[in-house]
Amino acid sequence: NLYQFGKMIFKMTGKSPIFSYGDYGCYCGWGGKGTPVDATDRCCFVHDCCYGRVNSCNPKRSTYSYSFQNGGIVCDDQNLCKRAVCECDRVAAICFGENVNTYDKKYKDYPTSQCTETEQ
C-alpha cells in the first residue's frame, strides 16, 4: 500500500516520500501525462505503468509482506497479487535510490501544464 511504498522510498533514498516525491515532475503523484522530465520522474512513470498492470489487485490499498535485507527490499508475500504490487513498489524505490543524485528541486511541484507530449 502507499504507506509501505513510502517506507521503501525512505529506506532507499533517505528522503521524505510525500514531500520529495508526492508531486514531482509529470508522473510522481496522482495521475500523469506527457514525457517524464528526468530519471526520477521516469521511475514514477514506470511505477504508474506497473500499477496499471496490477490494477485488479488494488495496488494503492493492498497490504503486502516484505522486508529489508542486506540493504535491499525483499517481497515475500505468498499471495501472488500482493507480491506483484510489492514488486512494483520495490522496483520504484530502488529506482529512486539509484537516481537520488540527479533529483532536481526545480521539478518539485512542477506545473502539469508543462507536461506535454514531445514531438518525435
From Swiss-Prot:
<dbReference type="Pfam" id="PF00068">
    <property type="entry name" value="Phospholip_A2_1"/>
</dbReference>
<feature type="active site">
    <location>
        <position position="47"/>
    </location>
</feature>
<dbReference type="InterPro" id="IPR001211">
    <property type="entry name" value="PLipase_A2"/>
</dbReference>
<comment type="function">
    <text>This non-toxic acidic phospholipase A2 hydrolyzes monolayers of different short chain phospholipids. It exhibits anticoagulant effects upon human plasma in vitro. PLA2 catalyzes the calcium-dependent hydrolysis of the 2-acyl groups in 3-sn-phosphoglycerides.</text>
</comment>
<comment type="similarity">
    <text>Belongs to the phospholipase A2 family. Group II subfamily. D49 sub-subfamily.</text>
</comment>
<protein>
    <recommendedName>
        <fullName>Acidic phospholipase A2 Cc1-PLA2</fullName>
        <ecNumber>3.1.1.4</ecNumber>
    </recommendedName>
</protein>
<dbReference type="GO" id="GO:0006644">
    <property type="term" value="P:phospholipid metabolic process"/>
</dbReference>
<dbReference type="InterPro" id="IPR033112">
    <property type="entry name" value="PLipase_A2_Asp_AS"/>
</dbReference>
<feature type="binding site">
    <location>
        <position position="48"/>
    </location>
    <ligand>
        <name>Ca(2+)</name>
    </ligand>
</feature>
<feature type="active site">
    <location>
        <position position="89"/>
    </location>
</feature>
<feature type="binding site">
    <location>
        <position position="27"/>
    </location>
    <ligand>
        <name>Ca(2+)</name>
    </ligand>
</feature>
<keyword id="KW-1199">Hemostasis impairing toxin</keyword>
<feature type="disulfide bond">
    <location>
        <begin position="26"/>
        <end position="115"/>
    </location>
</feature>
<feature type="disulfide bond">
    <location>
        <begin position="28"/>
        <end position="44"/>
    </location>
</feature>
<feature type="disulfide bond">
    <location>
        <begin position="43"/>
        <end position="95"/>
    </location>
</feature>
<keyword id="KW-0378">Hydrolase</keyword>
<keyword id="KW-0800">Toxin</keyword>
<keyword id="KW-0106">Calcium</keyword>
<comment type="subunit">
    <text>Monomer.</text>
</comment>
<dbReference type="GO" id="GO:0016042">
    <property type="term" value="P:lipid catabolic process"/>
</dbReference>
<dbReference type="GO" id="GO:0047498">
    <property type="term" value="F:calcium-dependent phospholipase A2 activity"/>
</dbReference>
<dbReference type="GO" id="GO:0050482">
    <property type="term" value="P:arachidonate secretion"/>
</dbReference>
<dbReference type="GO" id="GO:0005576">
    <property type="term" value="C:extracellular region"/>
</dbReference>
<keyword id="KW-0443">Lipid metabolism</keyword>
<dbReference type="InterPro" id="IPR016090">
    <property type="entry name" value="PLipase_A2_dom"/>
</dbReference>
<dbReference type="GO" id="GO:0005509">
    <property type="term" value="F:calcium ion binding"/>
</dbReference>
<dbReference type="GO" id="GO:0005543">
    <property type="term" value="F:phospholipid binding"/>
</dbReference>
<feature type="disulfide bond">
    <location>
        <begin position="75"/>
        <end position="86"/>
    </location>
</feature>
<feature type="binding site">
    <location>
        <position position="31"/>
    </location>
    <ligand>
        <name>Ca(2+)</name>
    </ligand>
</feature>
<dbReference type="GO" id="GO:0090729">
    <property type="term" value="F:toxin activity"/>
</dbReference>
<feature type="binding site">
    <location>
        <position position="29"/>
    </location>
    <ligand>
        <name>Ca(2+)</name>
    </ligand>
</feature>
<keyword id="KW-0964">Secreted</keyword>
<keyword id="KW-0442">Lipid degradation</keyword>
<feature type="disulfide bond">
    <location>
        <begin position="50"/>
        <end position="88"/>
    </location>
</feature>
<keyword id="KW-1015">Disulfide bond</keyword>
<keyword id="KW-1203">Blood coagulation cascade inhibiting toxin</keyword>
<dbReference type="InterPro" id="IPR036444">
    <property type="entry name" value="PLipase_A2_dom_sf"/>
</dbReference>
<dbReference type="InterPro" id="IPR033113">
    <property type="entry name" value="PLipase_A2_His_AS"/>
</dbReference>
<keyword id="KW-0479">Metal-binding</keyword>
<feature type="disulfide bond">
    <location>
        <begin position="57"/>
        <end position="81"/>
    </location>
</feature>
